[in-house]
């Protein structure tokens, strides 16, 4: 429901707010699957999806914190540019009315901002990719665990989880659509308002934390996945480690597990998820 509402939002922060509700639903779906698996004696799978849900909370926090900060930077600069144009313009009653009616959070007043705010645009792209679950970026690793293990529970007798399993699969494509739409409306294409020419990148006090959060968003999820974050968060491991493998061996293991699981049913689920989130959703935007 939250993902569907995000489809039609023009307020950049409302898109992110409804996205947060949608991602929380992912987390709770994972916790529900974990509970069923624990109750049926499948403790290993239950622990993994429980750890995956907690891992997704971390990945989502990194990405969404950065996205809200980046969107705030965009809103501030758009508002500042509009004020600049207002003070340069005439002082008529109509001008005052249009000034007060202007919404700096409305993406319909943006467009083409990537050339004006390259750091912010890059940060929001990486954050959006993490929320979408683009392969190898942040949230992909935890979302893959939640979707895979929820379908695993259904395939092993949890008929009540068919609805949630279908919904989180469909939501993967919906997330790809509304997050791509947000980025394209804000940063791509031709400017839809003359104020865009007066927009510039934020100060280093904003850019620096954006860069730090972008690195954590892009690489943090991957790095933690390689070092066994899911097993650690599920209490299956006492600490983060490479489990006796070299770094390259562990990277290959995680990539194979994500893209080529032994269970063919889960392999198809994973490929459909990637198709919906990475290709169909963004193309439709």
Q: Where do the PLM segments sit?
A:
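Membrane-interfacial helical/loop segments at transmembrane boundaries in membrane proteins
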Residues: 145-156, 227-264
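Glycine- and aromatic-enriched alpha-helical transmembrane segments of multi-pass membrane proteins
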Residues: 207-225, 259-285
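Hydrophobic transmembrane alpha-helices and their helix-loop junctions in integral membrane proteins
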Residues: 1-202, 216-223
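Hydrophobic membrane-spanning alpha-helices of multi-pass integral membrane proteins
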Residues: 24, 127, 206-220, 241-257
């Amino acid at each position: 429901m939250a993902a569907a509402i995000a489809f039609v939002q023009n307020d950049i922060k409302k898109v992110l707010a409804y996205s947060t509700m949608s991602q929380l639903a992912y987390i709770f779906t994972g916790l529900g699957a974990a509970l069923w698996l624990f109750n049926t004696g499948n403790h290993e799978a239950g622990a993994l999806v429980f750890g995956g849900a907690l891992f997704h909370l971390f990945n989502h926090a990194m990405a969404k914190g950065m996205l809200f900060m980046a969107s705030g930077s965009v809103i501030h600069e758009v508002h500042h540019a509009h004020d600049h144009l207002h003070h340069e313009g005439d002082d008529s009653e109509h001008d005052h009315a249009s000034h007060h009616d202007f919404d700096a959070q409305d993406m319909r007043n943006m467009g083409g901002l990537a050339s004006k705010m390259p750091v912010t645009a890059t940060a929001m792209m990486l954050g959006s990719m993490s929320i979408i679950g683009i392969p190898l970026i942040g949230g992909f690793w935890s979302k893959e665990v939640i979707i895979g293990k929820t379908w695993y529970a259904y395939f092993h007798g949890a008929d009540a989880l068919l609805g949630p399993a279908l919904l989180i699969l469909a939501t993967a494509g919906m997330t790809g659509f509304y997050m791509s739409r947000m980025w394209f409306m804000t940063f791509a294409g031709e400017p839809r308002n003359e104020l865009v020419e007066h927009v510039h990148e934020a100060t280093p006090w904003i850019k620096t934390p954006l860069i730090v959060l972008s690195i954590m968003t892009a690489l943090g999820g991957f790095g933690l996945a390689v070092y066994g974050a899911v097993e650690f968060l599920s209490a299956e491991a006492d600490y983060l480690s490479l489990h006796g493998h070299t770094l390259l061996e562990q990277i290959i293991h995680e990539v194979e597990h994500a893209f080529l699981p032994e269970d063919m049913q889960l392999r198809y689920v994973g490929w459909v998820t990637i198709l919906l989130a990475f290709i169909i959703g963004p193309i439709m935007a």
